[in-house]
Structure formats: C-alpha cells, structure tokens
C-alpha cells in the first residue's frame, strides 16, 4: 500500500466511487441496493451530501504496485440515522473499500476518519447496519470500538435469499 490521504469526495471522484459501489451491488449483499448506480445517480448522491454528511475518499497517492497515483481505493459517509428530530445526534456510517485493496487496513482508517468527523460534528452515537454474514465488516467495526446491539432477522432479500442485518453502535464520549 502506498501513502493514503483522506479528503472530501467531489464529483470528479464519482466514477471511481461508482465502480467500487456497483461491484458490491452486483456481486455481494453488503448493500441491499439491487440496481447498479448510473454515473448521474452517483453525481447526484455526491452533490446532495454536505457538512458532516459529506462523503470522504481514501486516495492512494503513491501506489508502488503501479496503479495510477491518486486512485480512490475506498470511500465512506455518515448519514442521518432516522428522520425524527430526537435522533438528530445519531448517524449511520457507510464504508466501502475497493475489493483488490481489502485487508490492507483501509476500511479501518475510513471508519476512524468518520468517527472523527462525527465527534467534531457533535454526534453522540454512530450506527452501522451490516449484513450479518459480513464477518469482515463486523470485525472491522469491532476493531474500531463498535458493539453489536442487535440482529434484525430476514429484513433484506437479495440473490433469492433472506439476509439478516447486524446493528452495531459506537458511542462517542
């Protein structure tokens, strides 16, 4: 792994973010989206995000393996946890790492960056809703201080089967 840097995502990153996300849509149950995003959808998603809810990208600025310098290797974002006003101090994270870069600590760095954004923005609780069979994502969140607080049974249907969701939570002191 080269040197990683984090920055706010811009529309220039839309195609690389879309490629990472659409791989998960088409090949895994990490997201319950069923239809890949178009480039326009991805640009609109990025343009709709601001402040604490801005997307961040992990960019490899010095990849010794010969990849293009400045490649987006992962992204993350915070989203409002629920619509009702009393939930305003809680957020939900989303973290995606390019498949060929899994296991290199990038996801951990993205989650830690999101926790820092959440703390700076005055949030109290960060939630992660993870496919319960997603052992890697569950382990990643545990490593970052999240605790399992519940399992929602058979709440998603993808690839002709039911999927449970693990609800994990990190309280910010």
Give short role names for the model-derived ranges.
Residues 5-17:
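A short beta-loop-alpha structural element at the N-terminal edge
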Residues 19-36:
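Helix-loop element at the rim of GNAT/NAT acetyltransferase active sites that forms part
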Residues 8, 34-100, 111-112, 117, ...:
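Acetyl-CoA-dependent GNAT
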Residues 77-80, 85, 127-131, 138, ...:
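Conserved catalytic-core motifs of GNAT/GCN5-like acyltransferases
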Residues 118-130:
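Conserved GNAT acetyl-CoA-binding A-motif
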Residues 16, 92, 125, 136:
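Amphipathic alpha-helical recognition patches that constitute DNA-binding helices
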Residues 103-120, 139-143:
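Conserved acetyl-CoA-binding loop-helix of GNAT-fold acetyltransferases
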